[in-house]
């Protein structure tokens, strides 16, 4: 069952100008240490940050709150599986909101996809609720833990 859908389009050049103007103040306010390390290792640093910015915006929309109700930028974090697939983790108020949205007997799965075509970065987030596996049953579709 689909619990929420969100999308966002970010301008890479705008993110680059923001990084140039505000530097660490912006990075530390919006991105986790893991997200910052990943972006700083990439040749397209601004594009990497822009995709993660868009993912956080899209996730906040899928949660049905936007960036309000106590949800902060760092409550949502994008990392990647070994395959490169992006995954979203939520903590704090975002995790609380996700728990509130998820029906009893279900688990929430956050699907995220990222793309860019300069000067645009886009993210799309779908929050799905799946029935919990019965005792002895294995849910083979649940994503592997993210690579840190």
UniProtKB/Swiss-Prot annotation:
One GO biological process term: fatty acid biosynthetic process
One Pfam family matching this protein: ACPS
Cofactor list: Mg(2+)
Signal peptide coordinates: none
Database matches in InterPro entries: 4-PPantetheinyl_Trfase_dom, 4-PPantetheinyl_Trfase_dom_sf, ACPS, Ppantetheine-prot_Trfase_dom
Keywords assigned: Cytoplasm, Fatty acid biosynthesis, Fatty acid metabolism, Lipid biosynthesis, Lipid metabolism, Magnesium, Metal-binding, Transferase
Protein localization: Cytoplasm
The UniProt record lists the keyword Signal: no
The protein's Enzyme Commission number: 2.7.8.7
Family per similarity comment: Belongs to the P-Pant transferase superfamily. AcpS family.
Name by which UniProt lists this protein: Holo-[acyl-carrier-protein] synthase
